[in-house]
Curated annotation (Swiss-Prot):
KW Coiled coil (keyword) present: yes
Region (Disordered) residue spans: 474-610
Its job: Required for the localization of dynein and dynactin to the mitotic kintochore. Dynein is believed to control the initial lateral interaction between the kinetochore and spindle microtubules and to facilitate the subsequent formation of end-on kinetochore-microtubule attachments mediated by the NDC80 complex.
Coiled-coil regions listed in the entry: 1-392
Protein name: Protein Spindly-B
GO cellular component: a single term: spindle pole
A molecular function GO annotation: kinetochore binding
Compositional bias of kind Basic and acidic residues: 493-511, 535-548, 570-583
Organism superkingdom: Eukaryota
Cross-referenced InterPro entries: SPDLY_chordates (IPR028593), Spindly/BICDR_Dynein_Adapter (IPR051149)
Length: 610
């Protein structure tokens, strides 16, 4: 009754767990559908946003082009205004220079006139002075002559000799000659003064003319340089004019259409560049958002892995409880069988004694009865041998089941440590990503571009391991539950001939996974041959009780694990290959400098290195 209640309770719990799993799957599907809908809506919104941003960028670009055109027009107008201003300034400077030249020329003419007037004034003053001096001299001479004439007239009246008269006449003549000579001397002096005055005037005029000449030479040099510049500019303009005329006359040249085509292409390429920039910015934002979501998911996965590693597996506990209950039931069945065998042995011992007594009483029997007795004795001996072999096989099966349980225990402890290490590794990777995003945001894109395998979450490993362990456990229990009234297959007969040394060597050389997968394979690797099957029949009274207590037959337990072994072999081979790859990667990392990246399935040995 207690066993039935526990079975009902376990079935009820199993049913509730199945219902919860169905609900969780339903809710998960709903969440996936809602997430896909939200993802589609987000994609549509992103497309709309990129379209609007692209349109706004195109409008911005067109407005910028208009502003640039207006700025160019304004610059052209300002340049024209500046050119006009420069032209006006140049014309004003030319006018000023011309006025200065005219003023300078008029000033020079006035200076010339002034110099001439000064020279004439000096000459007039000199002539006036000379005339005054001459007048004074003439008046003095006249006064002297009048005095002499008066004296002569007075002396005329006096008597004088002729010699005296001649001498006086000579004297007068000499005096007149002297006066004439003095007059000539004065005239020459006057002439000399006039010549000196004219010489000074001429020297001053010469100096003025030299200065004018130098100024005119400077003006001529400036005019010549300006003329040369004008000639060069004229030549350049003439060359440009000739080139423009040749291009206009050339039919192959496209002229302004080529520039217009180039401008159109440039504007089109700029529009495409703007659209690509907008799309790149939107994709960059989407990448940042997805990276944040991946970061959060990694944190959640790390916490879940740590929680799952810290908690014990309820399926494992239930399975162990079921195994304990099954073992208890097996012990009870074995005790009942021992009692039944003792009773049957006592009956068999009493049977031959009674038959021997009857034989002595009856006397001589036929030869046929003796033959049957001999056959019965031989069959009983064979039955004893088979029972001994069966007990030995049971002990081997119990040892194998104990070994399987120990290996399962080690496997589950390793799985728990693996999950804990995976959680710690995930946390370390999350912290590493945070530090890289904080201190080296530009290096994240370079690291992301490295080739790496797709990361898979190790959530199904526990299910595979538990299925493999359950199948191995059921096989071991099936072998241990074999009784003389049950059917045994060829695999059970092959296990009888395996020595203990071969089993120990095979378990030492092979991994636990190979021990679990290949319990029936001989050590030489050859497939087992078909052997004869031995079927031992017992009373019908004992068989239904055994079938009730242990409904699983040996054939069922031997056939079902075979299929599960074949399924689990591929999985465990993959696990072995992954372990070898991890060992090779660890050796290469020990040789090469360490590179921090996110692997697909982190191993426990990589945690201390990172």
């Amino acid at each position: 009754m207690e066993e039935s209640e526990t079975v009902l309770k376990l079935r009820r719990q199993l049913k509730e767990a199945e219902e919860e799993r169905v609900k969780a799957a339903h809710y998960g599907l709903e969440l996936l559908e809602s997430q896909s809908d939200l993802q589609n809506q987000l994609e549509e919104q992103r497309n709309e946003m990129t379209g609007t941003i692209e349109n706004l960028e195109q409008e911005k670009y067109s407005l910028q082009r208009e502003v640039e055109l207006k700025n160019r027009m304004l610059e052209s107008l300002t340049s024209e205004c500046e050119n006009i201003r420069q032209q006006q300034k140049l014309s004003l400077e030319q006018l000023e220079e011309q006025l200065e030249r005219n003023h300078h020329r008029e000033l020079s003419e006035i200076k010339d006139k002034l110099e001439k007037l000064k020279a004439e004034l000096d000459e007039a003053r000199l002539s006036e002075k000379q005339l005054k001096h001459k007048l004074d001299y003439q008046t003095e001479v006249l006064a002297n002559k009048s005095e002499e004439l008066r004296m002569m007239s007075e002396r005329v009246h006096e008597t004088m000799s002729s010699e005296m008269l001649t001498l006086q006449l000579e004297k007068t003549e000499l005096e007149t000659a002297k006066d004439n000579l003095e007059q000539e001397l004065n005239e020459l002096q006057y002439r000399e003064q006039q010549l000196l005055l004219t010489n000074g005037n001429q020297s001053r005029q010469l100096e003025r003319l030299q200065t004018e000449k130098e100024e005119r030479e400077k003006e001529a040099v400036g005019y010549f340089s300006a003329l040369e510049k004008a000639r060069e500019a004229n030549q350049d303009l003439q060359a440009q004019l000739d080139i423009a005329l040749q291009q206009a006359q050339d039919p192959n040249s496209k002229g302004n259409s080529l520039f217009a085509e180039v401008e159109d292409r440039r504007s089109e390429m700029e529009r495409q560049l703007i659209s690509m920039k907008v799309q790149f910015q939107s994709l960059q934002k989407q990448h940042a958002f997805s990276r944040q979501q991946m970061h959060r998911m990694k944190i959640q996965i790390a916490t879940l892995l740590q929680l799952k590693g810290s908690h014990s597996d309820p399926e494992q506990l239930e399975r162990l409880q079921a195994m304990v209950a099954q073992k208890n039931s097996e012990i009870e069945t074995l005790v009942m069988k021992v009692r039944q065998l003792e009773k049957s042995q006592q009956i068999c011992e009493n049977g031959p004694v009674a038959s021997s007594c009857d034989g002595l009483g009856q006397g001589d029997e036929t030869y046929y009865v003796d033959l049957l007795k001999m056959k019965l004795v031989n069959s009983s001996k064979e039955i004893d041998k088979v029972k001994d072999e069966l007990s030995l096989q049971r002990m081997k099966a119990l040892a194998e089941s104990q070994r399987v349980l120990e290996l399962e225990r080690k496997l589950f402890t390793n799985d728990r440590h693996l999950k804990l290490s995976q959680g710690e590794n995930m946390k370390l990777r999350v912290n590493l990503d945070e530090m890289k995003m904080k201190y080296e945001p530009d290096e994240m894109g370079k690291i992301r571009t490295q080739k790496r395998r797709k990361e898979q979450l190790p959530l199904d490993c526990l299910i595979d391991n538990t299925s493999v362990a359950v199948t191995s456990g059921t096989e071991a229990h099936g072998v241990s539950d074999a009784t003389p009234g049950e059917t045994c297959t060829a695999e059970s007969s092959d296990d009888k001939k395996l020595p203990k040394e071969d089993l120990s060597l095979s378990t030492k050389d092979q991994d636990p996974s190979s021990v679990l997968l290949k319990p029936n394979e001989p050590p030489n690797g050859q497939p087992p041959k078909e052997r004869k099957r031995v079927r031992i029949m017992e009373d019908e009274k004992d068989t239904p009780d055994l079938n009730k207590r242990n409904p699983n037959n040996c054939t069922i337990t031997s056939i079902h694990p075979r299929s599960t072994y074949e399924e689990s072999t591929s999985e465990l081979k993959k696990v072995d290959e992954e372990q070898e790859k991890r060992k090779q990667e660890r050796k290469s990392r020990l040789r090469a400098p360490p590179v921090l990246h996110v692997p697909s399935k982190p191993a426990t040995a990589q945690c201390p290195q990172q």
